[in-house]
Amino acid sequence: MFTWIWPFIGGLIGIIVGAFGFLILDLLHLPIIIGAALIYSFSIWFTGFHHLDGLIDFGDGMMVHGSPEKKIDVMRDKRIGTGGIAYLFMIGIITFAAIGSSPVILIFYILLVSEIAAKMGIITWATFSKPFPDGTGRYFIESMNKKLLLLSFILASAIGFLIFNILGIVGITMGLLSGIIIVLIAKKNFKLATGDVLGASNEVERMLALVIMITLFML
């Protein structure tokens, strides 16, 4: 019933990840490439690699040709295929590059907003998805609705503005929009939503929020 507060939990995660980034780059002055690798590694380690596991399974399912049921079966098996490795590499390398492209002085704020945006995307996905009957994502999907999504988006956008001005709102909005994109992709390929799609959406939405905020800042 508290799925709508996930962006604010993401904010707490973002404070920790952002503080780590500040330590690595601002205080210790490590080279930006090494720092980006350490920050991204810390981020996925801190959340227990759960979302990364979902991303790999999602990639495997996306590579399968056939019915949604066949795709879900592949997504749920324990083996790792080429699709999973490819998605892991693509999302990972772009996220790493985005962190490495961030202005050092702003690293804390960018990382903080990106984690809020990632969770904003997850609850957007949950709002518009139909759950798999015995999937772990069912509990999150059933507790979300459009009113709660709007409330969460307004509050998260306000926080984003306080953290990073207009670019903070842009990052949060990107999280919401990318959540809708994941919904459309998942419905086309799987019809029903699973916990693996939830995990994949977190990684994709964080990446897209980072990319768009940094790109616009550099303009």
Predicted regions located by residue number:
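Juxtamembrane transmembrane-helix boundary signature
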Residues: F49-G54
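Generic anion/oxyanion-binding catalytic loop in active/binding sites
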Residues: D60
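Hydrophobic alpha-helical transmembrane segments
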Residues: M1-G48, M63-K70, D77-K78, G84-L219
